[in-house]
Amino acid sequence: MKTTIKDIKTRLFKIPLKEILSDAKHGDHDHFELITTTVTLEDGSQGTGYTYTGGKGGYSIKAMLEYDIQPALIGKDATQIEEIYDFMEWHIHYVGRGGISTFAMSAVDIALWDLKGKREGLPLWKMAGGKNNTCKAYCGGIDLQFPLEKLLNNICGYLESGFNAVKIKIGRENMQEDIDRIKAVRELIGPDITFMIDANYSLTVEQAIKLSKAVEQYDITWFEEPTLPDDYKGFAEIADNTAIPLAMGENLHTIHEFGYAMDQAKLGYCQPDASNCGGITGWLKAADLITEHNIPVCTHGMQELHVSLVSAFDTGWLEVHSFPIDEYTKRPLVVENFRAVASNEPGIGVEFDWDKIAQYEV
C-alpha cells in the first residue's frame, strides 16, 4: 500500500544559543536540542516532525524513538494518525506516562500530520479546523539574570520587531527585585502593551500570593507557573486569593493531566506544547478540552509550528520563544500588524534548513 510506513529516521542536533539564558528552575541554557523524525512511505513521500528540549534528554528521546517506537511502526498505514497515536501511547505507557515518551510520540505524530497535509494539499491551520491563519503573539524572554538595563533593552527589541506583548521571567532570590523589575518594565512599555510574568514554578503558594498582590497594580495579563504544575489545588488557592489570572500547560504531557488542571487549577489561560504532549494530535485533544472550559488556548515554544494551531482556535496567544527553532527553517516566523502569520504551504508549514543545522548534529 502506498501509504504504508517504510522507514523512519531520527536525528539529534545541539544548537547553541547566542547568549546564556536563565530562569528560576532550569538554570542556565547555552544550547537547545532539536530532535527530528522523518517518516518515509512506500510511495516515497516524506513527512518530518520534531521535538525539542532545553538541553537535556535528547539522547533519551532519540533512543526511545529508534529502539522502541520506530520498529513497531514499520508497515503501519500512515493515514491512520489517531490509531497510531493510541498505539504509541499504550506501546510505551508502562515505562513512560508523559515525559520522554510523549516527546518521542510528538515527533512521529507531527511527521504524520506533515504527510497528511502534503497528501491533501492543506496547510496545518486548515487541517486543524481553522478559518483564520493569524493569531496574537508575544515575546517570551528567558531573562531572569539579565541586569535591569539589559532586560529593558531586550524588551525594546521585542517592540521594535513588531510585537505588542511581552513576558519576563521572575523568581529571583529577593522577591523585591522581581517586583522592581516588573514595575520598571510596565513603566517602560506604557499602559497599552500586554505584559505577562513567568516564575517557572519556583515559588511556594504563599510566595506566589504575596508577589501577585504586590504587582497586580501593573496590569499583568497572566502569572505563569507560579508554583509546581502538579499542584493543581495550589494553583486554585493562588487563584482564589489573587486577581491576576494564572497560566500553565507546558509541563502537562497527557490529556489526563490537562483534565486535572481544568477541573482543579482555576486557570485563566492554558498553554499546551505540541512538542511534549503527543504532537498535533495530543495538542488538539488538549485544546478541545481547554476550549470546553472556556479558557483561551495558548502555546509554549516552537512558534513556527504553533502559529498554525493557535490561529486555528484564535482564542489565545502564541509564545515567541527564546529558543529560535524558526531561524533554522526555510520560513522563520512572519509577523504582520502585531499578529503572527501561519504558512499556507501544504503540511505543517515547517521545513528545516538542513544545510544550516547539519553542523550541529550529534
Curated annotation (Swiss-Prot):
Which CDD domains does UniProt cross-reference here?
Answer: MR_like (cd03316)
Task: Please give the catalytic activity noted in the UniProt record.
Answer: 3,6-anhydro-L-galactonate = 2-dehydro-3-deoxy-L-galactonate
Cofactor(s) required, per the database record = Mg(2+)
- Does the keyword field hold Amino-acid biosynthesis? no
Q: InterPro entries, alphabetically?
A: AHGA_cycloisomerase, Enolase-like_C_sf, Enolase-like_N, Enolase_C-like, Mandelate_racemase_C, Mandelate_racemase_N_dom, RHMD-like
Respond yes or no to whether keyword Metal-binding is given for this record. Answer: yes
Binding residues for Mg(2+), per the UniProt record? D198, E224, E250
**Protein name (database record):** 3,6-anhydro-alpha-L-galactonate cycloisomerase
Q: Which residues form the active site?
A: K169, H300
**GO MF term list:** hydro-lyase activity; isomerase activity; magnesium ion binding
Known uses: Could be used for bioconversion of red macroalgal biomass into biofuels or industrial chemicals.
Q: Which family is this protein grouped under?
A: Belongs to the mandelate racemase/muconate lactonizing enzyme family.
Q: Which GO terms describe its biological process?
A: galactose catabolic process
Q: What class of enzyme is it?
A: isomerase
Record's function text:
Involved in the degradation of 3,6-anhydro-L-galactose, which is the major monomeric sugar of red macroalgae. Catalyzes the isomerization of 3,6-anhydrogalactonate (AHGA) to 2-keto-3-deoxy-galactonate (KDGal).
Enzyme Commission number(s): 5.5.1.25
- Species assigned in the record: Vibrio sp. (strain EJY3)
| SS bond partners | none
Against Gene3D superfamilies, the record matches this protein to: Enolase-like C-terminal domain (3.20.20.120), Enolase-like, N-terminal domain (3.30.390.10)
Arranged from A to Z, the UniProt key words for this protein are: Carbohydrate metabolism, Isomerase, Magnesium, Metal-binding
Query: One Pfam match, by short name?
Result: MR_MLE_C
